[in-house]
Amino acid sequence: MFLLHEYDIFWTFLIIASLIPILAFSISGLLAPVSEGPEKLSSYESGIEPMGGAWVQFRIRYYMFALVFVVFDVETVFLYPWAMSFDVLGVSVFIEALIFVLILVVGLVYAWRKGALEWS
């Protein structure tokens, strides 16, 4: 039978974990001195005078590489726990993981054919 009080620890932890950052940002916003000036609006490069403009437009290739990296990084996050418990889960979970990997391979082939991985 589903009893709501079994999850009291979870809800307590969730509320505390949500309140700590909210309180930290609120207190720092109330206690921090407000000082606006021209230096506050200038860009910062490790204590050195900035060279050039602060707003630089990056080429789309950087974003494509970042997107492909994130996709395969997420794949690793999903597949590692599956690999650690492979012997317990059974054949059906193996087939699901295989479908997941095949979908990612199709995405990789698509990105490759579109030239997203070429740096010319």
Curated annotation (Swiss-Prot):
Main location: plastid
Native source organism of the sequence: Hordeum vulgare
GO biological process: photosynthesis, light reaction
Protein name according to UniProt: NAD(P)H-quinone oxidoreductase subunit 3, chloroplastic
Alphabetical list of HAMAP family matching this protein: NDH1_NuoA
Family: Belongs to the complex I subunit 3 family.
Reactions it catalyzes: a plastoquinone + NADH + (n+1) H(+)(in) = a plastoquinol + NAD(+) + n H(+)(out); a plastoquinone + NADPH + (n+1) H(+)(in) = a plastoquinol + NADP(+) + n H(+)(out)
A GO CC term attached to the entry: NADH dehydrogenase complex
Keywords noted in UniProt: Chloroplast, Membrane, NAD, NADP, Plastid, Plastoquinone, Quinone, Thylakoid, Translocase, Transmembrane, Transmembrane helix, Transport
Known partners and oligomeric status: NDH is composed of at least 16 different subunits, 5 of which are encoded in the nucleus.
UniProt KW Transport keyword: yes
Protein role: NDH shuttles electrons from NAD(P)H:plastoquinone, via FMN and iron-sulfur (Fe-S) centers, to quinones in the photosynthetic chain and possibly in a chloroplast respiratory chain. The immediate electron acceptor for the enzyme in this species is believed to be plastoquinone. Couples the redox reaction to proton translocation, and thus conserves the redox energy in a proton gradient.
EC number: 7.1.1.-
Membrane topology note: Multi-pass membrane protein
Domain of life where this protein originates: Eukaryota
Lineage: Eukaryota, Viridiplantae, Streptophyta, Embryophyta, Tracheophyta
Family matches, as InterPro entries: NAD(P)H_OxRDtase_bac/plastid (IPR023043), NADH_UbQ/plastoQ_OxRdtase_su3 (IPR000440), NDAH_ubi_oxred_su3_sf (IPR038430)
